[in-house]
Amino acid sequence: ETGLKTATEVANKDHVKLALEHDIDMLWIGARSTVSPFIIQEIADELEGTDKIVLVKNPVNPDLALWIGAIERLQRANIKNLGVIHRGFSTYEKTKYRNIPEWQLVIELQNKFPLLPLICDPSHITGKRDLIFDVSQTALDLNFDGLMIETHCTPDEAWSDAAQQVTPAQLVQIMKDLRIRKTSVAEEDYLSQLGTLRSHIDILDDQLLDLLKKRMEIAEEIGKLKKANNVA
């Protein structure tokens, strides 16, 4: 009715069969499937030789080898239109993100597969709609190829992940506010590399500030413990 492309997550060969039968345009493999070589192989066997777009989300935990292994299994299945989705990684620590970005791991993946399309999922990384823009801009500054942002007509009434969804109007505004570096062909490579390196520094600065914050919190706990035990 709309002419829009359709996409769905597949977690086993039966999902793949149904998706192909209904001519779904794009398939993605979720983070919890990426962790299992057995599931990935099952999906790869069913998709062998397909020209459908197939995207692989990073595994739940920050394990680059698992992510690479999943990509290589799908490559061996001669999947012609393969890409990856960065949705962040789970952590036991409390941070402002639902899933920490660990941008350095994605940069390593980019270096290994420079021609592989890379999509960022800021909705799952942030878990909060008010952080989506900043993470999206960081992804574009790191030369990501696209974004996967959750939208809902009435986000607060969504059955799942309500806090990380935006209205269509909010999505339009996010897209308008995002900036993509535009340069001449002669300058493009230099400025792209320079911008990426500067983004790397920004990421490291954020990590350092986060570590210092955690250090201060621990020092404060030590102070409270000493005070409670009357220790100078």
What are these regions (language model features)?
Residues L178-A232:
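Extended, charge-rich alpha-helical interface modules
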Residues E1-Q41:
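Active-site beta->alpha loop and helix N-cap motifs at the rims of alpha/beta catalytic domains
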Residues P168-I180:
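C-terminal active-site "lid" helix and adjoining low-complexity regulatory extension at the edge
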Residues T2-L4, K112-L116, L178-R181:
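A structural motif corresponding to the C-terminal end of an alpha-helix
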Residues P37-Q170:
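Catalytic alpha/beta core domains of metabolic enzymes, predominantly
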Residues E1, H152-A163, I222-V231:
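Glycine-rich, proline-tolerant flexible connector loops at the mouths of alpha/beta enzymes
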Residues V10, P122, T151, I203-D206:
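Generic detector of well-ordered alpha-helical packing
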